[in-house]
Design a protein with these regions (language model features):
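Glycine-rich nucleophile elbow surrounding the catalytic serine of serine-hydrolase chemistry
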Residues: 152-162
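N-terminal cap/lid segment of alpha/beta-hydrolase-fold proteins
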Residues: 21-56, 457-463, 528
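Short beta-strand/loop motif that positions the catalytic acidic residue
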Residues: 279, 285-287
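Conserved alpha/beta-hydrolase "acid-adjacent" motif
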Residues: 292-299
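C-terminal, loop-rich substrate-recognition/catalytic regions characterized by aromatic stacking residues
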Residues: 224-226, 231-239, 326, 332-618
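Cap/lid segment of the alpha/beta-hydrolase catalytic domain
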Residues: 52-140, 189, 327-339, 450, ...
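Alpha/beta-hydrolase fold nucleophile elbow
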Residues: 142-154
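Accessory cap/linker subdomain of secreted extracellular hydrolases
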Residues: 80, 88, 110-123, 127, ...
Length: 618
């Protein structure tokens, strides 16, 4: 059943956002600053903003951040409180510097591990700090109604998720948005063993250890000496040289990121997912299909709650957004790809209703468990679960660059290319120093003439085909080296003979690297035997994408994606400490015979499903 969202439905959100841009915080809110003592005596800075002249009790909406609760000082006010439109709804807003950051005392630990069992009454982690903060707020902030919500994006989303663990009874609603969850398995640091280089280096040049309390960042702007990231990182050499040449061994957070190349205890204790159980607050998880940092964490947080705390009210909203993009834009496009409407407005309306229902006892609004934007079709859809019911399908890599639903029979056995670490495949035609978020939808034509990228394509589709959920490449490969990466990109190839301005566009739908030495274990890497055929299988993050009639489904396979990921020297070694002589060309072979049927597996959404409805926003 198709349900149209008429213009009046969005009018409230559009007006709310317009009003938010004009809403004066200082005229409408009174600010008070506090130092809140934790159970171990460490005091955390919190700024409390309460509506002026409001006599009724109000709920508290908390945000915890490592990025500064500024502006500091009782007379200094931010431009916004909470998401757009929230300030007009009258909450008591609290913004807190987490332990060891900016104006809070204590030692900061990057992604501080959560403990299932505390060592004593003064033992702390992010869960206890949130509990102690909430306990103090409800007992000491005037005019609160005893109900607390928490909201945060990215690192703030991680803190919002942490609040769900051994949560305070007053915490009744939480919205982790683009939350980190497992840094090694697909979030900010590593994807299938490959290090996300440009995102982490640019982040940790500014995110440094502080001598707190401090009101401003102590990191001066980093001088790259060039605006060409490809050139800069190629000249950097092995990652261990980054400390010596650029950061002078002064940032332990960066060093920890690149040195722990396997899924060792450093990463395992920082994996939040096993701890998210027995959740009592209602949860609204929010994420973007084009989140280059924490798409994996968003989906896994939702799935962990549904699996490990099945009675918890847990909703998921996924839109066509980059990392946190719903917070600062309309959500109408990303790069060259337009989505047909201002998608972020739909989210803001849902957010407000969610918190008003649980914090202010507002009448419940009929909102689905999963509210998902289908890219390609540019439609919002609602479902009882994510992923929805779907039919498994495989596309097989075939000779001649073909991609087919039919498995190979007798045909040439493999395709091959030479991967050279001295000339890695770029992830964008030109890459500035910060990671380019638009790479998630970018046209892949710019690598079509490279001999180290192999493309496979279906015939034009005779009807629309929607892929929903995770994608699983299953490749049979060999290498002349002792280690190699195998990066897979799923692409929507637009017709070349249409009048569409994007005619011939090869839109990236999902891409993911895989470091070959981890094909059997992320804790015990294994060298390749040169020339030996090996099977590599891995999961790529979920998509919800409609390949339209007349489009082609394309797959590209390559062995570098630079400087999005660090270079694999193609010699089995500890990559951060690789020597220049370890970086060698390697011949990579992708096999597609009846004995070695390389393929990509995914779920196809049926055209009509019970409990699955299409919502067209106008």
């Amino acid at each position: 059943m198709i349900i149209s969202l008429f213009v009046p439905f969005l009018a409230f959100s559009l007006l709310a956002s317009a009003a938010a841009n004009e809403f004066d915080i200082q005229s409408n809110y009174a600010k008070t600053e506090y130092k809140i003592a934790m159970r171990d005596g460490v005091k955390l800075y919190a700024a409390v903003y309460a509506p002026r002249g409001y006599t009724a009790t109000l709920p508290i909406l908390l945000t915890r951040t490592p990025y500064s609760a500024s502006p500091y000082g009782p007379e200094n006010y931010p431009k916004h409180l909470g998401p757009l439109g929230f300030a007009e709804e009258k909450f008591i807003f609290v913004v807190e510097d987490v332990r060891g950051r900016f104006m809070s005392e204590g030692d900061f630990v990057d992604v501080r591990p959560i403990k299932d069992v505390l060592d004593g009454p003064k033992d702390v982690d992010e869960s206890t700090d949130t509990y102690d903060t909430i306990d103090w707020l409800v007992k000491n902030v005037p005019g609160n109604n005893g109900k607390v919500g928490i909201i945060g994006t990215s690192y703030g989303g991680y803190y919002a998720t942490s609040a769900l663990i051994r949560s305070h009874p007053a915490l009744v609603a939480a919205s982790p948005q683009a939350p980190m969850a497992d840094l090694y398995r697909g979030d900010d640091a590593y994807h299938n063993g490959a290090f996300f280089l440009v995102a982490n280096f640019s982040f940790y040049t500014g995110f440094v250890k502080q001598k707190n309390p401090v009101s401003t960042s102590e990191a001066p702007p980093f001088d790259y000496g060039t605006d060409d990231a490809y050139k800069f990182y190629l000249a950097m050499g092995p990652l261990a040289d980054s400390d010596r040449l650029y950061l002078l061994n002064r940032n332990p957070y960066w060093t920890d990121m690149y040195r722990h190349t396997t899924e060792d205890s450093f990463w395992k204790v920082r994996n939040l997912l096993p701890h998210i159980k027995n959740v009592t607050p209602a949860v609204l998880v929010v994420g973007g299909w084009y989140d280059a940092e924490d798409l994996s964490g968003t989906l896994k947080t939702y799935q962990a709650i549904r699996r490990q705390s099945p009675t918890t009210v847990c909703r998921l909203i996924m839109g066509p957004w980059s990392h946190g993009g719903w917070n600062y834009g309309k959500g109408d496009k990303l790069g060259d790809i337009a989505f047909g409407n201002d998608t972020a407005e739909v989210l803001r309306d849902s957010e407000i209703h969610f918190f008003k229902q649980y914090l202010k006892d507002a009448p419940p609004v009929d909102q689905p468990p999963a509210f998902m934007f289908e890219t390609g079709a540019n439609e919002w859809k609602i479902s009882e679960q994510w992923p929805p019911a779907r039919t498994p399908q495989k596309l097989y890599l075939r000779a001649g660059g073909k991609l087919s639903f039919k498995s190979p029979a007798q045909e040439p056995d493999f395709d091959e290319y030479v991967s050279d670490p001295a000339n890695p495949v770029p992830y964008m035609p030109h890459s500035p120093q910060d990671m380019v978020k638009e790479y998630m939808t970018a046209d892949q034509h710019f690598v079509s003439n490279r001999k180290d990228v192999i493309s496979y394509s279906t015939e034009p589709l005779t009807e629309d085909l929607t892929i929903a959920g995770p994608i699983s490449p299953n490749l049979f490969v060999s290498t002349s080296g002792s280690d190699s990466d195998f990066d897979v990109k799923l692409i929507d190839a637009y017709p070349t003979d249409s009048q569409d301005p994007l005619a011939g566009y090869q839109q990236l739908v999902r891409g993911e690297p895989f470091r070959g030495k981890f094909r059997n274990s992320f804790t015990k890497p294994e060298a390749f035997t040169p020339g030996k055929v090996e099977e590599i299988r891995f999961d790529m993050p979920d998509v919800y994408h409609c390949f339209k009639k007349g489009h082609r489904i394309m797959l590209q396979v390559q062995s570098s994606w630079f400087p999005l990921t660090d270079r694999n020297p193609q010699t089995f070694t500890d990559i951060p400490n690789a020597k220049p002589s370890d970086f060698v060309p390697a011949t990579e072979k992708i096999y597609h015979s009846s004995r070695t049927p390389s393929s990509i597996e995914f779920g196809v959404e049926p055209t009509a499903l019970p409990n699955h409805e299409t919502v067209t926003s106008r």
